[in-house]
Amino acid sequence: MKRTIAIVAGGDTSEFHVSLRSAQGIYSFIDKEKYTLYIVEMHGLDWHVQLPDGAKAPVDRNDFSFVLDGEKVTFDFAYITIHGTPGEDGRLQGYFDMLHIPYSCCGVLAASLTYDKFACNQYLKGFGVRIAESLLLRGGQSVTDEDVMEKIGLPCFIKPSLGGSSFGVTKVTAKEQIQPAITKAFAEAQEVVVEAFMDGTEITCGCYKTKDKSVVFPITAVSYTHLRAHETELH
């Protein structure tokens, strides 16, 4: 019997449409002969399943189910493709944990901590990891250009503490760019980070875990040429 998988997409941030594209990609990759797939689109309290005929079926949030042809359909697994809240910040993970539905990504603690850039850096700093100097601004809190210049210096990055895909992020290279960059970042989140620029090679190391083993990918360097191309396409 085929397992029924929910590809969860959408969310409540500027990354909404990026997430929908990710979901379509995942949907195209998974073998339909082995699994029954549905894209579940979420936006606020509007949760619905995209049906093959183009119709939409509302999701019962009490047990993450929907009705198709008079029959209740439940999910065996949730593949979370939401970029931003509630898919990357631990909220959906907690919801699925309570319903005992397995899902594709890390748990509540790791998701909520790593989604908050400032909090994650402070956590790592406690273990002796060297991080860039930064300031945290909350709820529209102001800071003078002089304070930024003195405490952080230029160039620097001003960005939402929560979120991704470079939305609201500005590389500041001149004093007159500071306040517009802060305003731009606050349009995306209620907490903004002013962070010193670090010049060097950026590396990353991905991994995934199955019920049988953990797989670690090779260490790779981030290509800024590819990043700039991605940001141009995205925005």
Identify what each model region corresponds to.
Residues 71, 211-215:
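Short, solvent-exposed loop/turn segments that connect beta-strands within catalytic domains
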Residues 226-229, 233-235:
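Single conserved hydrophobic/aromatic residue that forms the stacking wall/gate
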Residues 54-57, 122-124, 151-152, 210-212:
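Short, hinge-like loop/turn segments at secondary-structure boundaries
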Residues 1-104, 108-109, 113-115, 119, ...:
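ATP-binding N-terminal substructure of ATP-dependent carboxylate-amine bond-forming enzymes
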Residues 102-106, 131, 215-216:
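Short hydrophobic/aromatic-enriched beta-strand-loop microsegments
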Residues 3-9, 13, 21, 113-201:
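Active-site nucleotide/adenylate-binding loops and adjacent lid/helix of ATP-dependent enzymes
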Residues 49-51, 206-207, 228:
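Short, well-ordered secondary-structure micro-motifs
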Residues 44, 141, 162-164, 198-202, ...:
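Glycine-rich beta-alpha junction loops
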